[in-house]
From Swiss-Prot:
Range of residues in the leader sequence: 1-19
Active site: D289
The keyword Acyltransferase is assigned to this record: no
Region (Disordered): 677-697
Uppermost EC category: hydrolase
Bias (Pro residues) ranges: 681-691
Protein name per UniProt: Probable beta-glucosidase F
One annotated Gene Ontology cellular component of this protein: extracellular region
Organism: Aspergillus fumigatus (strain CBS 144.89 / FGSC A1163 / CEA10)
Length: 869
């Protein structure tokens, strides 16, 4: 069976850009157009070479020895995908077999191996974020790395830390870890470390400003929207998680489809050359999102290193911006040989750094079919066939971690009268299709492009097939001795009600990627808004009208409105189970029946009304004319906005109840590194980078080999007449404005992976003792927020910077948690000096500790005392 999702994506690219989503008329108050704001992205050339950091020195030394002996064809092969459907993976490069480098396999997704078999479908990123558990974040990364390696995948296309969740209706928010830069940063970094510990290259994405799905891609009818972001907001919010991912040593970065400040991300020299490779010291390689390359020479000069899946503007035509055209650009001199050498060296260095030159398996699965045999290159139409699926089981015992994450993410919003946990003999009436299976069968919807049965993940390329699914219905039936099930979204008229009955109502809200439209929602939640799908609100209200005790279970991609029913006296408890993956049922019953106390916390704010958000974060729609999406709210997204506007949400960021209670005591603050200056000490100088001959290679290096058996539509580096291409080298290429080959001075904010290493000096350590003061075992989360002094200018009143989670505490027992605060954590970005500015010695900084952004338990003032609130 062909991959329907990829076909849908191709169709969407070829379709007219002149029509608005069908649901637009129903949500006109949420879809708005904006005029151009005059934002532009200044040029920054040339692209900095990699290899100047000691942490990558060995990998670059190995890469240099190989790359210096490569032909032009071999170099181009490694930078260009072979074309969509031209191999087993969603993307693969060409090879350099003389040096033992195979076609590199790149594969989704951040939660499991996409379009495969015998894999684990882990909980989604938003669920992982809700655990506030660094150990689980790392463990999931390790097991993802093991599974991808076991399938022969070189590059895992995750984690996602963008979108960050600026727009609550954004379609792909659920792939990341939550609507806060530090939560995203910690979740992303822990995941990267875990993945790469297994020798698989992680890819942090989508760089940057892809906060809406609609109109994200440029095509023949319309340019992608431009995310217009000021410099301070870019650094303090949207770059923050990418910087931490780079500091964690990530091997690859994927660009976003959209533009930033009127320049496409895949050829934005400011973003790629200056910020990513110079300021943040990124040593790996930059790839496009699939079919997100919009130019050849321009993208190479701007810092792009790999084009995926390789096709040009229209896929499956056998044409590319790179491939043979990159060979031509090298021969005619429009792309310097030095730029190509750096592109290839970055890719090969990442391959070496992960140890993939050792015993690394080749792909043993196919994204294109579930059959054992089939065409090796399905996009060619006429393709040799062979074994494409070996059905290698990579699951091991990873279901244990998957269940632990799904369980520890469950967030208890409300528990009146301590109705939870339930007893096994309670009389239960269970309502809602979200409790049951997909009636069409497991994995019946390609890339989860439907909302049928329990919602385990959103839809799109960020999904994986479920190897199995234990539904809430199955799990409850297995445990409860007295449960009746009504797997319908319309409240039945014939339900018998007894005085002791507990109604458990399941509702959901879904979203996903733009190439699939589900129930009128083209990725973003346009038709549904922030409401529950499938009559969910009415189902809860109808149950509340009949039963005196109602428990609501919510599976959702993000914030969901609850005002229609949350204050009804019958609605006693609400659990948000997020997107639990394959362990949806068991993880829920672990908490529902009290084997574990809930310990999840909201990774976003739940508002009382959608109008509580700033108007600038609504979805935008403007057919034909390019959309200008200007970030006028600046630093104030999610809870930061609610605090600034003095709006009380329904449930604040970080909120989460337990079956027990906790006290915070004995807060302490200690100085680790004295901050004796406003700005960090001078950055270390760059080390040497690999050097190569810069002469244009002989055209014969990209001539077609004799008796070569070509695959139709496969993207090769070869030219029919390479000598003719070389003869055109005297022509002057129309380079981008500001293009130069003269290197820029090293930015003062750089110096290592993630920036100036002094930014990550630990300035303070804060400790607090957490005690279980209740009657049941449980785990607590301490959230650390900083409040910066007025001397730094206007800043959000509280910003999450760290968190820590206790082990399971028995009643009456305690644990002391310690969290570290870096110089960067208490800094703001100085747009004039272009560096991070902190108060000297941290004077005026307050450090808040609590269980949510609105539930503070202790505060420490730098230079003063700590106290319990």
């Amino acid at each position: 069976m062909r991959v329907l999702s990829a076909i849908a994506l191709v169709a969407s690219l070829a379709s007219s850009a002149l029509s608005a989503p069908a649901s637009e008329s129903r949500v006109s108050t949420q879809l708005r157009s904006r005029d151009a704001e005059g934002y532009s992205s200044p040029p920054y050339y040339p692209a900095p070479n990699g290899g100047w950091l000691s942490s990558w020195a060995d990998a670059y030394e190995k890469a240099q020895r190989v790359v210096r002996d490569m032909t032009l064809a071999e170099k181009v092969n490694l930078t260009t995908g072979t074309g969509i459907f031209m191999g087993p993976c969603v993307g693969q490069t060409g090879s350099a077999l003389r040096f033992g480098i195979p076609n590199l396999c790149l594969q989704d997704s951040p939660l499991g191996v996409r379009n495969s078999d015998h894999n684990t479908a882990f909980p989604a990123g938003i669920t992982v974020g809700a655990t506030f558990d660094k150990d689980l974040m790392y463990a999931r990364g390790v097991e993802l790395g093991k599974e991808f390696r076991g399938k022969g995948i070189n590059v895992l296309l995750g984690p996602s830390v963008g979108p960050i969740g600026r727009k609550p209706r954004g379609g792909r928010n659920w792939e990341g870890f939550g609507a806060d830069p530090s939560l995203q940063a910690i979740g992303g970094a822990q995941t990267i470390k875990g993945i790469q510990s297994q020798g698989v290259i992680a890819t942090i994405k989508h760089y940057i400003g892809n906060e809406q799905e609609m109109y994200r891609m440029s095509n023949v009818g319309q340019r992608a929207y431009s995310s217009n972001i000021d410099d301070r907001t870019l650094h303090e919010v949207y770059l923050w998680p990418f910087a931490e991912g780079i500091r964690a040593g990530v091997g690859a970065v994927m660009t976003a489809y959209n533009e930033v400040n009127s320049s496409a991300c895949s050829q934005n020299s400011k973003l790629l050359n200056e910020i990513l490779k110079d300021e943040l010291g990124f040593q790996g390689f930059v790839m496009t999102d699939w079919l997100g390359q919009y130019g050849g020479v321009s993208s190479a000069l701007a810092g792009l290193d790999m084009a995926m899946p390789g096709d040009g503007a229209i896929p499956l035509l056998g044409t590319a911006y790179w491939g043979s055209e990159l060979s031509r650009s090298i021969l005619n001199g429009s792309v310097p040989v030095s730029r190509l050498n750096d592109m290839v060296t970055r890719i090969v260095a990442a391959w070496y750094k992960m140890g993939q030159d050792g015993d690394f398996p080749l792909p043993n699965f196919s994204s294109n079919t579930q059959d054992a045999t089939g065409p090796l290159y399905p996009g060619a139409l006429f393709s040799p066939s062979g074994v494409v699926n070996q059905y290698v089981n990579v699951q091991a015992d990873h279901n244990i971690t998957a269940r632990a994450i799904a369980r520890d993410a469950i967030t208890l919003l409300k528990n009146d009268d301590n109705i939870l946990p339930l007893k096994k003999d309670d009389a239960l009436k269970v309502f809602g299709t979200d409790a049951g299976p997909n009636p069409d069968g497991l994995n019946s919807c390609a890339d989860m492009g439907c909302n049928k049965g329990v919602l385990t993940m959103g839809w799109g390329s960020g999904t994986s097939r479920l190897p199995y699914l234990v539904t809430p219905q199955e799990a409850i039936a297995n445990i409860s001795s007295n449960a009746a099930f009504f797997i319908t979204d319309k409240f039945p008229s014939n339900v018998a009600v007894s005085s002791g009955d507990v109604a458990v109502v399941f509702i959901s809200a879904d979203s996903g990627e733009n190439y699939i439209t589900v129930e009128g929602n083209p990725g973003d939640r346009t038709s549904a808004g922030l409401n529950a799908w499938h009559n969910g609100d009415k189902l809860v209200k109808d149950a509340a009208a009949k039963f005196s005790k109602v428990v609501v279970v919510v599976h959702t991609v993000g914030p969901i409105l609850m005002e229609e029913w949350i204050d009804l006296p019958s609605v006693k408890a609400v659990l948000v189970a997020h997107l639990p993956g394959q362990e949806a049922g068991w993880s829920l019953t672990d908490v529902l029946f009290g084997d574990y106390s809930p310990s999840g916390h909201l990774p976003y704010t739940i508002p009382r009304a959608e109008s509580d958000y700033p108007s600038s974060v609504g979805l935008l729609s403007q057919p034909i004319v390019q959309i200008q999406d200007t970030y006028t709210e600046g630093l104030y997204i999610d809870y930061r906005h609610f605090l600034k506007a003095n709006i009380t949400p329904r449930y604040p960021f970080g909120h989460g109840l337990s079956y027990t209670t906790f006290s915070f005591s004995q807060p302490t603050l200690s100085v680790r590194t004295a901050l004796d200056s406003t700005y960090p000490p001078t950055r270390p100088p760059k080390g040497p980078t690999p050097t190569y001959p810069t002469a244009i290679p002989d055209p014969s290096e990209v001539a077609w080999p004799k008796n070569f058996d070509r695959i139709w539509r496969y993207l090769y580096p070869y030219l029919d007449d390479p000598a003719s291409a070389a003869k055109n080298s005297s022509k002057t290429y129309p380079y981008p404005a500001g293009y130069t080959t003269v290197p820029k001075p090293a930015p003062r904010a750089g110096g290592a992976e993630g920036g100036n290493p002094a930014l990550f000096d630990v300035a303070f350590a804060v400790s607090v003792t957490v005690t279980n003061t209740g009657s049941r075992p449980g785990r607590a989360v301490a959230q650390l927020y900083v409040e910066l002094p007025d001397s730094l200018g206007e800043t959000p009143s509280r910003q999450l910077r760290q968190f820590a989670k206790t082990k399971t505490l028995a009643p009456g027992t305690s644990e002391t948690l310690t969290m570290e605060i870096t110089r960067k954590d208490i800094s703001v970005w100085d747009v004039v000096v272009q560096d991070w500015k902190a108060p000297v010695r941290g004077e005026g900084v307050k450090i808040w500790l609590g269980e949510s952004v609105l539930d503070m338990r202790a505060v420490c003032e730098v230079g003063g005392a700590c106290r319990v609130i």
